[in-house]
């Protein structure tokens, strides 16, 4: 049985994005097929086979650059801790360097999954300062030396080859993200709506995501000014990347409140159960990202039978079927006015036509059941592990 070490920043209960959710479910399914250990950041976990690693205190300054140096210190600890495994599998730049160092030290294959690419996220320089150059260095070093690179969408595969032309295309494998439809399924809860101050008698559009440039929240707030004022916009968003983006979003949100009202803002992390309830009652889920390698939040919405309006970027067109499970809106950074106008138009259409929204929502869940199950994803991943082992035997 192949012994696999998964290296990741996020792991339950410390999960804040799609990559962490991916690792959670992938590890669960892989354990049914092979031996798995997990190495993650943060506090100790009670789960067997999970080891936490923490940054060196001596690297706490200068800010914000120290964050990247702290990440590298955790990677050193991870690399040292995985001696004796057969395969190392890293996720995101926060753990990729650890996988690369483990490959060099212990002569084991390194598999890395690409959830996003640093060269395509220039706004991260606001958060990391000069540390952004280090995050890109970690990613590039690891991806060019990895034995196999998993792209979570065809769009990501193309992006890898564009950003890092030295990567051998034969080492790139597309294995889509997935979801557990037994967890994410329609679950009505009028009580949850009441608790968050959402009017159950008014249609509403839902956004769920971090306050970052990537997720396009400023664009959604601009589009909100064109939404029918009778309809509600519910936003679940917190953890801003920087004070600058926090201030910008707060100003836009206040303008929406002043000019149209019916904005419900949930500015904290909410349990998965509550989010599923919101998806179930929402008439449309909105994903206005300007960069989205895959879009796991879209799968979550579709699994709950919610129609989707999303940007036509990255891997999203591989999830949303135009006119069947929702609508895709073309994004052009040079013409955001057209984007926000068309985004608002599609949202208004689905908030007004309940029958169409329900039809698209049901089609979305069928698509999730047919194409995005975790057991098949884990099986393909184990096949990839096994294909690499003879090369280093």
Residue ranges and their predicted role:
Residues 155, 178:
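Carbohydrate-associated surface elements
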Residues 290:
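Aromatic "clamp/platform" in nucleotide-sugar-dependent glycosyltransferases that forms part
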Residues 21, 203-226, 247:
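A conserved mid-protein helix/loop that constitutes part of the nucleotide-sugar donor-binding site
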Residues 307-310, 320:
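Short hydrophobic beta-strand element within catalytic cores of glycosyltransferases
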Residues 90-95, 114:
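Short His-centered aromatic/hydrophobic patch
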Residues 277-282:
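Short alpha-helical donor nucleotide-sugar binding micro-motif in glycosyltransferases
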Residues 246-269, 273:
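Nucleotide-activated donor-binding/catalytic signature segment of Leloir-type glycosyltransferases, i.e.
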């Amino acid at each position: 049985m192949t012994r696999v070490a998964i290296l990741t920043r996020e792991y339950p209960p410390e999960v804040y994005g799609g990559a962490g959710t991916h690792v959670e479910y992938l590890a669960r399914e892989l354990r049914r097929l092979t031996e798995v250990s997990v190495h993650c950041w943060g506090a100790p976990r009670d789960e067997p086979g999970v080891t936490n690693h923490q940054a060196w205190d001596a690297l706490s300054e200068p800010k914000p650059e120290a964050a990247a140096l702290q990440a590298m210190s955790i990677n050193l600890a991870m690399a040292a801790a995985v001696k004796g495994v057969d395969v190392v599998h890293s996720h995101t730049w926060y753990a990729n360097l650890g996988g690369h160092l483990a490959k060099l030290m212990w002569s084991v294959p390194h598999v890395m999954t690409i959830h996003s690419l640093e060269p395509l996220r220039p706004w991260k320089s606001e958060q990391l300062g000069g540390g952004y150059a280090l995050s890109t260095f970690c990613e590039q070093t690891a991806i060019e030396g990895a034995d196999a690179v998993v792209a979570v969408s065809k769009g990501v595969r193309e992006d890898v080859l564009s950003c890092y032309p030295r990567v051998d295309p034969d080492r790139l494998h597309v294995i889509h993200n997935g979801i557990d439809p037994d967890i994410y399924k329609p679950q009505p809860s009028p009580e949850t709506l009441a608790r968050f101050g959402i009017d159950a008698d008014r249609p509403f559009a839902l956004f769920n995501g971090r306050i970052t440039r990537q997720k396009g929240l400023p664009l959604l707030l601009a589009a909100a000014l064109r939404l029918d004022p009778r309809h509600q916009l519910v936003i679940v968003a917190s953890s801003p990347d920087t004070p600058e983006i926090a201030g910008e979003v707060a100003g836009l949100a206040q303008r929406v409140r002043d000019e149209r009202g019916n904005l419900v803002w949930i500015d904290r992390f909410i349990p998965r159960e509550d989010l599923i309830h919101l998806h179930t009652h929402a008439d449309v889920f909105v994903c206005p990202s300007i960069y989205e390698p895959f879009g796991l939040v879209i799968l979550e919405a579709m699994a709950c039978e919610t129609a989707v309006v999303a940007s036509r970027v990255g891997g999203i067109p591989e999830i949303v079927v135009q006119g069947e499970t929702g609508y895709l809106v073309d994004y052009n950074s040079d013409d955001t006015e057209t984007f926000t106008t068309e985004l608002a138009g599609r949202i208004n259409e689905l908030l007004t036509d309940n029958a169409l929204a329900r039809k698209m929502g049901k089609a979305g869940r069928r698509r999730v059941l047919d194409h995005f199950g975790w057991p098949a994803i884990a099986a393909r991943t184990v096949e990839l592990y096994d294909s690499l082992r003879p090369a280093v035997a």
